[in-house]
UniProtKB/Swiss-Prot annotation:
GO terms for cellular component: bacterial-type flagellum; plasma membrane. It comes from the Bacteria. This is Flagellar FliJ protein. The keyword Protein transport applies. Gene3D superfamilies: 1.10.287.1700. The lineage of its organism: Bacteria, Bacillati, Bacillota, Bacilli, Bacillales.
Amino acid sequence: MAYQFRFQKLLELKENEKDQSLSEYQQSVSEFENVAEKLYENMSKKELLEQNKEKKLKSGMSVQEMRHYQQFVSNLDNTIYHYQKLVIMKRNQMNQKQEILTEKNIEVKKFEKMREKQFKMFALEDKAAEMKEMDDISIKQFMIQGH
């Protein structure tokens, strides 16, 4: 008699859900990394711009150039603020996806444990049935020999 886990279809469904959650988590990690990279790039641009402004101030800078730099820094600050908000949002999404993935992993592990226990019970029952059958055969052989 072959072993058949009674919740196999449910286990497969849970595994599919886990795989889907893993895919969504990986996607959210990728999105978070992309947004964080954009934030870093913009912060680096601002730092470079500030350094260039300092150099130009020492060597002399027109009022027009100063306004231009100030406008550019202001725009960069707005962009940086936007990306900071996005980073926070993407981090929260990533954390939510990670929690969901953890829950799905736990569900799958429960079913795998259940399958393992059920298989052990099946193996024990099968072994007991086999031993009983062997005992029956031994008794029949003993009886046939005329004892």
